[in-house]
From Swiss-Prot:
InterPro entries in alphabetical order: tRNA_endonuc-like_dom_sf, tRNA_intron_Endo_cat-like_sf, tRNA_intron_Endonuc_cat-like, tRNA_intron_Endonuc_N, tRNA_intron_Endonuc_N_sf, tRNA_splic, tRNA_splic_arch_short
Organism: Pyrobaculum islandicum (strain DSM 4184 / JCM 9189 / GEO3)
Name this polypeptide is given: tRNA-splicing endonuclease
Gene3D superfamilies: 3.40.1350.10, tRNA intron endonuclease, N-terminal domain (3.40.1170.20)
Superkingdom of origin: Archaea
Catalytic activity, reaction form: pretRNA = a 3'-half-tRNA molecule with a 5'-OH end + a 5'-half-tRNA molecule with a 2',3'-cyclic phosphate end + an intron with a 2',3'-cyclic phosphate and a 5'-hydroxyl terminus
Annotated active site: 120, 128, 159
Quaternary structure and partners: Homotetramer; although the tetramer contains four active sites, only two participate in the cleavage. Therefore, it should be considered as a dimer of dimers.
Alphabetical UniProt keywords: Lyase, tRNA processing
GO terms for cellular component: cytoplasm
Length: 183
């Protein structure tokens, strides 16, 4: 099935396919809905909006065909090009997204927590995201402000605050987590 590239998002207009993608891994968000539980999905008749990194992940796995507004196929390489042009540190952000997805986690936007991603073990509406992930640019060291922010955020939302970057030497995802603890 397909999704249409619109700006930096991919819109899945076929409702049945949108529901299937969401049920499979909580990909994207339904237009006009915030958080949808798996048991509510069949009641939704709205398009599914995928972030560019979500669409790329699905396209690379053959689960989604991305097309332009005129119907021409947009290959994963073109999605990567677009991401690099429009999104700072796109390669690293995508690598971090892919890292967590490949480990079996559900990865959603972490914007409401001031983070890049919220990472769930099973999915929104099933469990709470135990981790919020903040991107740390590879050339930037960790500051006292980063550590303070991590401590405050992990305490206020009771989640593991995780700084994530990609090593310039190895190309591997590197994580540093701060957990909330009651002393």
């Amino acid at each position: 099935m397909k999704g249409v590239l619109k700006g930096l998002a991919v819109v899945v207009e076929d409702v049945e396919f949108a529901r299937k993608l969401y049920k499979e891994g909580f990909y994207g968000r339904f237009l006009g809905y915030d958080k949808v539980r798996r048991e509510e999905v069949d009641k939704i008749s709205a398009p599914l909006i995928l972030a560019l990194y979500e669409a790329l992940y699905l396209a690379e796995r053959g689960k989604l065909k991305v097309v332009s507004k005129n119907g021409t196929e947009v290959l994963p390489e073109k999605l990567i090009e677009l991401g690099r042009e429009k999104i700072k540190n796109f390669d690293d952000i995508y690598k971090i997204y892919k890292y967590f997805r490949d480990l079996g986690y559900v990865v959603k936007s972490g914007l409401k927590f001031g983070a890049l991603f919220s990472v769930y073990e099973r999915g929104p509406g099933i469990d709470h995201a135990p981790m919020v992930v903040v991107f740390l640019e590879p050339d930037r060291g960790i500051s006292a402000t980063d550590i303070t922010r991590g401590g405050r955020l992990s305490h206020s939302v009771k989640k593991t605050f995780t700084l994530a970057t990609v090593s310039k030497q190895t190309g591997e995802v590197v994580l540093l987590g701060f957990s909330w603890a009651k002393l």
